[in-house]
């Protein structure tokens, strides 16, 4: 799927991946301009409730998942943004807002914008004369 992801990016499309911390850090090494958003639970209690609520894990697995999630939360500083996953619709909207802001980040397009105006400047100077 790596090729498919880069094909989408080459076409100018946003790609959203739901991945574990280890995968995110691997992507960050290969594609440093990627934007990383940490989706946090509203609270640790809610995190534990959600894990238990699935009803698919043993008590030992629940404890392991909870501890693993907590360890990942401690690495929040490796991400660019965070959101609290309270209400799905609100969380989705926050992610879309982050994507929109990133599209207007000067550091992403500084050279392209300057090149665009550089190409146009001579025509404008001619018109003014």
Task: Give the residues covered by each predicted segment.
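NTP-dependent small-molecule kinase module
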Residues: 56, 74-129
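Residue-level signature of catalytic and energy-coupling elements of molecular machines
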Residues: 16, 69, 83
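An amphipathic alpha-helix signature
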Residues: 44-48, 59, 89-92
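ATP-dependent NMP and nucleoside kinases share a basic, alpha-helical "lid"
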Residues: 1-55, 73-76
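Alpha-helical initiation/capping and key positions within long helical/coiled-coil segments
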Residues: 39, 61, 68, 87-90
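Conserved catalytic-core segment of NTP-binding enzymes
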Residues: 59-78
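Alpha-helical elements of Rossmann-like donor-binding domains used by nucleotide-donor carbohydrate transfer enzymes
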Residues: 4, 68, 94-98
């Amino acid at each position: 799927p790596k090729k498919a992801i880069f094909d989408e990016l080459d076409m100018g499309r946003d790609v959203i991946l739901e991945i574990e911390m280890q995968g995110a850090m691997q992507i960050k090494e290969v594609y440093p301009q990627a934007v990383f958003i940490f989706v946090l639970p509203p609270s640790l209690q809610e995190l534990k409730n959600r894990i238990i609520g699935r009803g698919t894990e043993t008590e030992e697995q629940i404890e392991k998942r909870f501890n693993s999630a907590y360890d990942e939360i401690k690495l929040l500083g490796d991400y660019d943004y965070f959101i609290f996953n309270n209400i799905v619709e609100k969380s989705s909207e926050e992610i879309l807002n982050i994507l929109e802001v990133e599209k207007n980040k000067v550091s992403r397009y500084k050279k392209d914008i300057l090149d665009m105006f550089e190409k146009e400047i001579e025509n404008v100077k001619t018109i003014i004369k």
